[in-house]
Amino acid sequence: MSRRCELTGKGVQVGNNVSHANNKTKRRFLPNLNDVTLMSETLGRGFKLRISAAALRTVDHRGGLDSFLAKAKDAELSEKALKIKKDIAKAQAAA
């Protein structure tokens, strides 16, 4: 399972621990990923996604999964999220 947010593309970053004596050792900064189920109002069902806590706040701020995906760039989304975005667009066009 990859350590990458399915909605924002946020992943692992690399940096240094720096001691008081200024010794540097490599370390990894891991994203705060959570397994959540987000509801789509258009499709009327939930989708299980692995997203960062920041992405969860952003989805809530933008008014839900449907509106978040409508504004999201395709390059940042995972294959699963892209499929959901296309299904939502198709359902909205049919309605």
Swiss-Prot record:
Signal peptide: none annotated. Keywords: Ribonucleoprotein, Ribosomal protein. The keyword Iron-sulfur does not apply. It comes from the Bacteria. One of its GO terms (biological process) is translation. GO terms for cellular component: cytosolic large ribosomal subunit. Gene3D superfamilies: Ribosomal protein L28/L24. GO terms for molecular function: structural constituent of ribosome. The keyword Ribonucleoprotein applies. InterPro entries: Ribosomal_bL28, Ribosomal_bL28/bL31-like_sf, Ribosomal_bL28_bact-type, Ribosomal_bL28_sf. Belongs to the bacterial ribosomal protein bL28 family. This is Large ribosomal subunit protein bL28. It comes from Dinoroseobacter shibae (strain DSM 16493 / NCIMB 14021 / DFL 12).
